[in-house]
Amino acid sequence: MDEKEIQRLVEEVSLQYFGMPFLHKVKFNSRLRTTGGRYLLKSHNVELNYRYYEMYGKEELIGIIKHELCHYHLHITGRGYKHRDRDFRELLKKVDAPRFCKRMINEEKEKKIYKYECMECLLQYVRRRQINTKRYVCGKCKGKLKPISKTS
């Protein structure tokens, strides 16, 4: 789905469920990580998370669009557009929009663990980040560190 298709879909959903046109722009924002979408108050544009479309499909995306359009239409008409406002919650129920989107299934990255050992006192260090062994030394005896293993 590209920018033109998503723009057309949002305009259709707006007319179908709200009876009002969507007059601004919608786009996918690849930087969104934990949210399905967001409504921008200053520009009145809507940004959507493409990964929700990839993961859950068009139906979930339409739910997110309806949620963001609730913010949009309430803000445009000067009514309560925030999550805590009664107008917002009533409009969500009316158009059957989700209050929250599904949780993203994180493909957990393998956490790397680096092990270092002091060459003098044999103290072992376990770290999640790499250490520059030319710059850092053992905190106990000031001896040189050598990498032992890197586990993923």
UniProtKB/Swiss-Prot annotation:
UniProt keywords, alphabetically: Cytoplasm, Metal-binding, Zinc
Instruction: Reply yes or no: does the keyword Cell cycle apply.
Output: no
Q: Which Pfam families match?
A: SprT-like, Zn_ribbon_SprT
Q: Among its keywords, does the record have Chloroplast? A: no
Q: Any note on cofactor binding? A: Binds 1 zinc ion.
Q: Which cofactor does it need?
A: Zn(2+)
The active-site annotation reads 68
Chief place of localization: cytoplasm
Q: Where does Zn(2+) bind?
A: 67, 71
Alphabetical GO CC annotations of the entry are: cytoplasm
Q: Which GO terms describe its biological process?
A: response to stress
User: According to its UniProt record, where is this protein located?
Assistant: Cytoplasm
**Occurrences of domain SprT-like (ranges):** 7-147
Molecular functions per Gene Ontology: zinc ion binding
The entry sums up its family as follows: Belongs to the SprT family.
Q: What is this protein called?
A: Protein SprT-like
Q: Which organism does this record belong to?
A: Bacillus cereus (strain G9842)
